[in-house]
């Protein structure tokens, strides 16, 4: 039962009962090399990932005190290199990559140049996202000359796919069209007034051209199933890929709900309170994730996406246990 997926379109059209998994990585911090990133991928590649997502991080402002005592504001990007990292992963491993393209911190020109770079590199699959608001902002503020919403970004990519640049000029030799996915939120986006409104926006992104969606992480499968049911009733037909992150530390009981705006189920919270160390919490997180994934596979969601930040070893253990049950195939070494 090896993974024969070669691109995201094949994955989305796969009508077999074969189980798949994918995962997300972050570009290295500015000044760091790729060794740690590649070690993490090396741990997970043996389980035949369908694709690897690479996040994009907007610039942020820091303040430095000058010699005269005044503060000077400087724009920095802590994790640059998304396009280069995506290309390096694709070349090194031959695994389909899906880099994030975001509105946050980017002008339309920035995005156009990024799309050109991706096209030159033969990268055809994208995740289109608005991106997070800046730390110092209460609400999302678009960059001057940038986009306010994902749908605006989608429109730019659609025009690019038609060979039209933002200045109205046209490509002499248009490349292959980008295929793109979007984010969705089983427990609604933090800025949405309610889940119904959030689902309307997901439907709009589908109508604009999105071909799949990946969820924010969640720990309660029933909330995910309810979300999918409501989405289908509202006309959302694109594949919805569930996103999972193993619970890793005791502190996450409080941090995760605030950071990712998702609930910790009462059963999981109760079990976590019995843990006496981070290692016990990590083992609990692995058990819970295995349980989640088995249940998702049983309900027909044959691709599960993992968020791996600070959790690579846990995801590896989850994969090992799924292999032991026969749900996934591991490469022979």
What kind of feature is each model-predicted range?
Residues 32-44, 108-115, 193-204, 285-295:
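Short, acidic/polar
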Residues 11, 131, 144-177, 182-192, ...:
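Active-site pocket-lining/capping segments in soluble small-molecule metabolic enzymes
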Residues 3-13, 35-50, 57-93:
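Glycine-rich, positively charged N-terminal anion/phosphate-binding segment
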Residues 28, 50-80, 133-145, 210-226, ...:
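Glycine-rich, proline-tolerant flexible connector loops at the mouths of alpha/beta enzymes
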Residues 107-120, 197-201, 226-229, 249-255, ...:
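Catalytic cores of alpha/beta
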Residues 108-156:
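Flexible, glycine-rich active-site loops centered on histidine and acidic residues
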Residues 24, 52, 118, 205, ...:
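Conserved, mostly hydrophobic/aromatic
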């Amino acid at each position: 039962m090896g993974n024969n997926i070669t691109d995201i379109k094949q994955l989305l059209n796969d009508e077999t009962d074969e189980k798949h998994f994918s995962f997300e990585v972050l570009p290295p911090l500015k000044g760091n090399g790729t060794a740690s990133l590649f070690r993490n991928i090396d741990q997970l590649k043996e389980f035949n990932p369908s694709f690897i997502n690479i996040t994009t991080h907007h610039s942020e402002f820091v303040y430095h005190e000058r010699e005269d005592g005044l503060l000077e504001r400087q724009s920095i990007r802590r994790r640059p290199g998304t396009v280069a990292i995506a290309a390096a992963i694709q070349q090194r491993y031959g695994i389909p990559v899906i880099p994030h393209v975001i509105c946050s911190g980017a002008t339309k020109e920035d995005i156009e140049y990024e799309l050109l770079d991706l096209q030159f590199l033969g990268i055809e699959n994208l995740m289109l996202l608005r991106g997070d608001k800046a730390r110092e902002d209460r609400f999302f503020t678009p960059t001057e000359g940038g986009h306010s919403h994902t749908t605006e970004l989608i429109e730019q990519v659609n025009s690019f796919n038609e060979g039209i640049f933002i200045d109205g000029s046209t490509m002499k030799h248009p490349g292959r069209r980008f295929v793109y996915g979007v984010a969705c939120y089983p427990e609604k986006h933090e800025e949405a007034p309610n889940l119904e409104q959030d689902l309307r926006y997901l439907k709009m992104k589908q109508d604009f051209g999105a071909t799949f969606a990946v969820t924010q992480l969640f720990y309660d499968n029933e909330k995910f199933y309810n979300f999918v049911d409501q989405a289908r009733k509202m006309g959302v037909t694109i594949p919805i890929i569930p996103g999972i992150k193993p619970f890793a530390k005791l502190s996450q009981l409080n941090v995760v709900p605030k950071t990712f705006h998702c609930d910790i189920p009462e059963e999981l919270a109760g079990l976590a309170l019995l843990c006496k160390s981070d290692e016990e919490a990590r083992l609990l997180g692995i058990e819970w994730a295995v349980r989640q994934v088995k249940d998702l596979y049983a309900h027909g969601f044959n691709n599960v996406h993992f968020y791996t930040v600070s959790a690579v070893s846990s995801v590896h253990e989850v994969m090992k246990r799924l292999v032991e049950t026969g749900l996934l195939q591991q490469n022979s070494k």
